[in-house]
Amino acid sequence: KRFKTKDHLISMLFCAFAKCTSLREVSGAMLGLSGKTKHFRLDHIPRKSTLSDANKRRDSDVFGMIYNKLMRTYGHYLSDSRIKDVINKQIEIFDSTTISLFKDIMKCVGRKPKSGKRKGGMKAHIVLNVDETVPKMIWFTHAATNDHVLLSKLKFNDNTIYVFDKGYNDYRAFKLFCEHKTGFVTRIKDNAVYESIHCNTIEDYIHSGVLEDKIIEITVKENNKTSKLRLRKIRFYDRVLKREFEFLTNLFEMRADLVAAIYKLRWQIELLFKQLKQNFPLKYFLGDNENAIKIQIYCVLIANLLMTVVQKMLKRSWAFSNLVSFCKIHLFNYIHLLRFLENPDKDWQKEQ
């Protein structure tokens, strides 16, 4: 009962920065160096059993709310409106990642390994603003869940364009996007069945890479009824990758090459996933229940958000991975982080 949410959060953030692989490591490290943890402002350093119980009983949504509150507080440091100024709409990327590469994600099938660490994984579905660098919304599912069922969770807005991969193809969801005047750009599936209605004129297609721009109709099956949905299909040749792409969108008025450029922005979320996996690897879960796994992932996202804000606040240029490594090294040192990072050689220069 005395292990409050604040202490729980600090303990799990310590786990993320120190890259601990077990609850025993988390508890043992903080207890062993308890004299150097005053700046953590912990009211109670947890033992392994205390942390395990808290991960099981404290609702993971609490940590989701903390993440969202931090986003509202520090969001102005993250915004970069250059892209929005060109498109004049909010572009949001929707994608998923499997947190760990091991199978049998939430089920923990089979015997417990000798190491006492259960291998597994969970799929995180993330919405990312193009003019920001951290997730805006997060949902968790079993890895076996089809991606397209998550489209219904997106918020419809006539000032928003969603970008997602063809794994999220769902014609009923596309119909809802059109009804709510919400834009989307995705890739058409290889086996898609459609009827060509009209071919748009392509201007300067050799320069822009647009090979084909046509209006098509697809059949939407819903509640034992079928209806027709009119969309736009663009065939585009990427000179860098030297391959063709076929895009599906409901942006009928936008230039075809601009639609292709919007889809290219989807790579930003891949960079986010790479950043998370490189700097806060989740190779092992510290609990064998869904709630504990979600808490661990939320705390990794909170750590990533805090480091991103620090990076944006600094005038001095720092690589993200170097910032995370620096914090790991100095976890038990009490320093003014921003002041030190602006001039890490200051004390050394004085001595010289």
Predicted regions and their residues:
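Extended, structured, electrostatic nucleic-acid-contact surfaces
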Residues: 31-41
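Single, function-defining residue in the core of a domain
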Residues: 1-25, 29, 58, 65-69, ...
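Active-site phosphate-binding and catalytic loops of NTP-dependent enzymes
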Residues: 76, 80-81
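Major-groove recognition helix of helix-turn-helix-like DNA-binding domains
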Residues: 40-60, 68
